[in-house]
Structure formats: structure tokens, C-alpha cells
Amino acid sequence: MIKSIPSISSEVDEEKIFKIINENFSQLAPAYYTLVTHWLINAYKVHKGIDKFIILIYLINKDFIFYRKNGLIVDYDTFYKDKSLEIPKINISDIAKDLLIPKENVRRKISELEEKGIIKRRGKKIFIERSGFIQSKTNVTLNDFSILVSKFSEVLKDKKITDKSFDTEEISKSIKENFSFCWYQFYKFIFIFTNSWKAGTKTQDLETICVGLIVLINTVQNRNFKNKN
């Protein structure tokens, strides 16, 4: 329950935040690229194909969208409590368009997920088995994500945008409590990120892009790395 009315003047200025990110990206880059690279590697490990996993989380994200539309916040433990997750009707054309994956590839990968028992149909309902998006992989991403947000909170404090910074444990706890909202935002980022790489490099091969990111992360973790902008 809100105990006091929020001040309109306290609204976050997105342009100012983006400017701070751009000007201080060298401080955020190691944590940022670690998050992305670990996610892509783990996505590949689950189904031996990054696109297949992205299609899976695209379907899962439909539930997160449903929660948002209905003003619901589902915490981490509740979300992972059941063995399966009901999802809306699968639309091949929408998936292909939104993820920049050819329709035939989408159709084939969904068929493979059904053959493995990850996607199951029970009458008119469709379910995803939890084994398809292993919880341990989420724990890795949660930790990496928390480190990045914690680092960014330090930057914001240094620039006097906020009064305090938050450690990784505080961030992780908050994400778990607001899991459906936070993971909706994270998945939205993943879709934008992978689509931009596909469009920018004109390749559908996210595995090759992942190799390039590993090289990049070795660069940004170098102590001599500087922001050239």
C-alpha cells in the first residue's frame, strides 16, 4: 500500500539516464557483456541452439505480458513452483516477425520442442515444461543482472542522481520479489539485443555472434580498456 503520494517531479528522466550510461559505459561494460555472454552460452547449452531457446522465452514472455496487463506481480518462487506453465496459442508468423527468424525455421524448432516434450498440448491448452528453461540457468542470469544493476547504482550515486547505491544481494532480493516485472523487461532487452545484432551483422547465426562477444568481453575486462567516445 502506498503511504504517500509520489511526487511528479521525482519522475526518472530517461534522457539523462541514457546520457549517463553512454558517458560511463566503460565502467559498466565488463558486467554488461558478462551478463549477455553468459546468457547466450547458457541458452545454447539448454537446447543446443540459441534461437530455439529465444523462441521458448518468447512464448514464456506472453505470460509476463498477461501479468502486466492485469496488474499482477509474480515472485520468483511462485513462478517456478509448478512443473509446467500454460501459454497462449502459438502464432508462427508473429514469432518469425518479432524475432527475425524465417517461418520454416520457427516451425521446425517448435516441432523439435514438441518432440522433446518441452511444449505439450492438452486439449486446447498449451503448456511448457519447466525442464525447458532450467531454474539453475536463471540463477546465473539473476546474479549477473544484479551485479550490473548494482554497478549502475554506484554510477548514479557518484553522479548524484540517487542518494545511495545498492549491493548485489539487495538487487537480487528485489528482482526475486518482482520477478515477473523484471524478467519481462529483461526478455524485452534480449529480443531487442539479438534482433539488432542480426540486423547489424546481417547474420542469423547467434552462435557466431556469441563467439564475437567472448572476444569483446576479454577486451573490456582488460584494465587498460577505456571508453573512446
Give residue ranges: language-model regions:
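N-terminal leader segment of winged-helix/HTH proteins
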Residues: 1-53, 158-202, 206-209, 213
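Short, cationic-aromatic polyanion-contact patches
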Residues: 74-77, 91, 124-148
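A short alpha-helical element within helix-turn-helix/winged-helix DNA-binding domains
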Residues: 78-97, 113, 229
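Short helix-capping/hinge SLiMs at alpha-helix to coil transitions
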Residues: 83-86, 217-221
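Short amphipathic alpha-helical interaction segments
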Residues: 100-115
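Short, amphipathic alpha-helical interaction segments positioned at domain boundaries
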Residues: 134-166, 170-174
